[in-house]
Amino acid sequence: MRREGSAIAADAAVAATSVKYGSDGRHGDHVAKLARQLYEAFSPMHMLGEDAERVLSHAAHLHDIGYFVAAKGHHRHGAYLIAHDQEMRDYPAADRLLLSGVVRNHRKRPRPAPKDWPKERRQALLWLSALLRVADALDYEHTQTAVITQVLSRDGGFDILVGGLDPRPFAVRLADKADMLADLCGGPIRFSEAMR
């Protein structure tokens, strides 16, 4: 998405697709906000550009559209809809494949990128998927209460401090969703409640 016009067309395609499939807009907006915070916090490690951040935001808005087809396998259904739906025709083709892959990988066991993708594109898929998984887990109950207050590099891993939500009851889910991010960072990802 190098040109302003294609970015506007992509935003419009995402908005239309989100509406068409009845996506929870408040959840999508909140997950996008959390994902952008994580994107910024981990930017020294992933070194991805502005285009990747836009794809991440779009994935946050579209990650649950597969529920329109079925709850079971909604990540796969969502990826298919993004790759094939006419509403997405104006989305840049290469970024559309990346977007579809990120949505596919937001839950369950992630799929690797196609071998013919350049290394940078494969890395983008891994990082964007990992960040979306954590952001979505932080708003799993669709309450829009979690706020990332700080991300700290500490003791060979990272501590994500969360306000508005006590992460302890969700420890297993958060650890499961942070597995990809931990692999990319080379250390554990820990969640704790931010001090008030």
Provide a role label for each language-model segment.
Residues 14-19, 27, 33-152:
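Divalent metal-dependent catalytic cores for phosphoryl transfer on phosphate-bearing substrates
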Residues 116, 191-192:
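C-terminal amphipathic alpha-helical interaction region
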Residues 25, 69-72, 168-175:
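Ordered, soluble secondary-structure elements with a strong preference for glycine-centered loop motifs
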Residues 2-11, 53, 151-154:
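Flexible hinge/switch segments at interdomain interfaces of large molecular machines
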Residues 132, 138-191:
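Low-complexity, glycine/alanine/valine/leucine- and proline-rich hydrophobic stretches
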